[in-house]
Amino acid sequence: MPDQIIPEGFVRQTRGSPLTDPWEPIYQKQTPEAIILGLWLAKPHTNARGFVHGGLIAALTDKAMGHSCGRQLRGAVSLVTVSMAIDFISSAQIGQWLTVETDVIKTGSTICFAQCFVKADGAVIARANATFRVVKKK
């Protein structure tokens, strides 16, 4: 949305995918520990009732947690989602700024654990946790 200001520290994401391309623009903010994703909610992000779609939340939480684990592992490996759980706490609507804020719990040579909170205008609307399998790049 052209009239909406992108919060400080956020830039266009550097790793798109065929799944998330229709939802662009998606932004990212790098911290020493993680990658925070953000976007202004628009009609393509919603369900038939005008609320943010759970599938969007699931995809963005998977992406944010996976990229954050990869950042901590210095990008030397690939990650595959083994399991993920999401609790939908509240809803979000068109025009709100959505962020996915990740905390990497533990990384190892074969597995990585992460959790995140999804916020709309700063209010928590979902939480998720995931386990990723660490795979050596070929």
Please report, for each region that a protein language model flagged, where it lies by residue.
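Terminal targeting signals and extreme-terminal segments of soluble enzymes
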Residues: 1-138
